[in-house]
Amino acid sequence: MVQRYQSPVRVYKYPFELVMAAYEKRFPTCPQIPVFLGSEVLRESRSPDGAVHVVERSCRLRVDAPRLLRKIAGVEHVVFVQTNILNWKERTLLIEAHNETFANRVVVNEHCSYTVHPENEDWTCFEQSASLDIRSFFGFENALEKIAMKQYTANVKRGKEVIEHYLNELISQGTSHIPRWTPAPVREEDARNQAGPRDPSSLEAHGPRSTLGPALEAVSMDGDKLDADYIERCLGHLTPMQESCLIQLRHWLQETHKGKIPKDEHILRFLRAHDFHLDKAREMLRQSLSWRKQHQVDLLLQTWQPPALLEEFYAGGWHYQDIDGRPLYILRLGQMDTKGLMKAVGEEALLRHVLSVNEEGQKRCEGSTRQLGRPISSWTCLLDLEGLNMRHLWRPGVKALLRMIEVVEDNYPETLGRLLIVRAPRVFPVLWTLISPFINENTRRKFLIYSGSNYQGPGGLVDYLDREVIPDFLGGESVCNVPEGGLVPKSLYMTEEEQEHTDQLWQWSETYHSASVLRGAPHEVAVEILEGESVITWDFDILRGDVVFSLYHTKQAPRLGAREPGTRASGQLIDKGWVLGRDYSRVEAPLVCREGESIQGSHVTRWPGVYLLQWQMHSPPSSVACSLPGVDDVLTALHSPGPKCKLLYYCEVLASEDFRGSMSSLESCTSGFSQLSAATSSSSSGQSHSSSLVSR
């Protein structure tokens, strides 16, 4: 595979003639570049008027490679042939170099140019490009490729420092100005000779002129190239190879997207997301640009006006900057009724609002860069989870959250600089287990999680936010104008017709199972658990009647028939001969659920075996205590048109390995999370009376 390098435009704030004098000091040897062992001139010529000077040199470079590789190759240094064409009249120096050693196995080509800055004739621009093609090298192709590119980029960085060193040396010696080239006076006889036929081989014989076209084209100043100072000032410090990847990806965009191309900081985010792997970043960016065009995301901030309901109940907003100058966004997720918002405005409106937040975040980063005079490419989010409960595990809401995470990860990589999660409750690990597989590993490293009140002390928010910026609801000094959220009134929910129009009813019906509960005939779902400390989650809506929900555990297998582990059976599963306390045990206290309520809950399992989720018709307390219906009750219920309860339910098992893994990843975010981890683990040692939450 051919490896390529392209430098940004590096600007020397000195005249071309002075830079050329500094450049010539590099020959025949240069102590400042240890790998450069020396050079000798092979050919040299000048044009009759002295304006063009052509020099061809043989340069020896020390091989900075492992001793074994040098021994196999049989060389301690390699030879390059360099051709310099200096044009004093045009004030340009074109440099071409290629390897002579191992030319049949490795092909290295380099093109460099020094030209006058297009906007300041007393400044000099330098550009450099190279290609490396390793065809065959004793089976060490990959190793040689890495060594060669590492050594090359190191020399690139050193090259600019060497020129600046010799410039300072010239100035210290009293040479701060060198006159520009002017043609010598031409006598009449010389003028007649110059007007005659010209020998076409006079200059062409001194160098491979056929290869100068691409070099000239590659380094021509077109007014749309990146210079190194701009990169350092607006994009941040980049290594030579990172600069090269940015320039190559930008050049690809200019060729394939003839119209407007993304801003440089946006392109750089995609490169950082893939650790500057050019092909992966290009494919991700290509798909994102197609997505932006399809959904007209570039116009979102001008066209999107959030509904008044969102502005009132969406508990998020911008709030000054963090200690590093990043824009700060506060989201009080625990105070937000995600289910109510989805039923009132729909998933698409919520997604558009989230996208507008990300678009605004990028805009604010640009403003911070201009204001602070240093690159700010990401923003900080302060996520307050006080109030987070089982209601937030409503399955359509979780699915919508996963979709939003996926869209943001795919199209806004590396926009989140830091995520500060405060007041994380015990239910958070369950939610984290559901969503963490969809979050990029690079993004997860930016999470800092605090449970309880440990965000208030050393190592807490004061390490990332100035005290006058910390919101008042977190004990800070700043009045925060972010909406407080709260429950969305059901009167604001969309009608069924409106929900059908947005396809929400269809999506939800695909997620849930329906069930009927008759008097004396409960509905039960069996969940087989193979390993303790797995997590069972449930989510159900009571459509008609009142029911009692319970969770049981048994080591005996109900009559499920032959089935694979992990599959579920439903219906009436508890054997009529079983005795509560002997054959099966209750692990969740009975919960009375009224018509119209929505219930979400979870249970951390203590033992393997079969867990039974049971819904039975609500009866007076004396009837609820009866664990099993009689045979006559069941037959009567099945053959009589008596009262019937209806519900929609969904249950899911988070495997023990996944749950423990998510806890480990949480604990790695901050040591303060160990308190929450211990609390969550201890909840599995007995009944958890608060593991279900009723949405009234």
UniProtKB/Swiss-Prot annotation:
Residues covered by region (Disordered): 178-214
Ranges of residues in domain CRAL-TRIO: 306-482
Positions of disulphide bridges: none
Every GOLD domain range: 509-653
This protein's GO CC annotations: cytoplasm
InterPro entries reported in the protein's UniProt record: CRAL-TRIO_dom (IPR001251), CRAL-TRIO_dom_sf (IPR036865), CRAL/TRIO_N_dom (IPR011074), CRAL/TRIO_N_dom_sf (IPR036273), GOLD_dom (IPR009038), GOLD_dom_sf (IPR036598), PRELI/MSF1_dom (IPR006797), SEC14/CRAL-TRIO_domain (IPR051064)
PRELI/MSF1 domain sequence ranges: 2-175
Domain of life, source organism: Eukaryota
Name this polypeptide is given: SEC14-like protein 5
Source organism (scientific name): Homo sapiens (Human)
UniProt lineage: Eukaryota, Metazoa, Chordata, Craniata, Vertebrata
